[in-house]
Amino acid sequence: YTVAVSSIYALYESLRLLEEEGLENRWNRHKVNAEKLRKGLTEIELNLPISPNDRLDQLTVVTKPDHIDDVEFRNKLIYDYNIEIGRGLGDFAGKVFRIGLMGESCKSEYVDQILEVFQKEI
């Protein structure tokens, strides 16, 4: 089999960016932006069903309000705002949204945009 060379280049570039930023700085950036996102979501009265001790800084789970259609809402975000969020999986399908803040997408301005759109559309 042939190795996917583009994957090797992507790994190299990802590791280069991580080295440039520093591991501790990257962890801190994820922590700060996750806290900002969670605070903003609770301020617009959305429920975060995962207990604080079990939360990940890279993924925030939000209970979907009953009046929101899951597919319609996620489609609106992606087509109107270029924001993609995940749906619930398994028993949580149609009940929660999953918002990822990982790597280069974990930026304060992205958190601001997500919160602004959620405030407007929910």
Where are these regions (language model features)?
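Structural signature of PLP-dependent enzymes
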Residues: 1-35
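Hydrophobic alpha-helical scaffolding
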Residues: 1-4, 63, 104
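PLP-dependent enzyme catalytic core of the Aspartate aminotransferase-like
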Residues: 91, 95-122
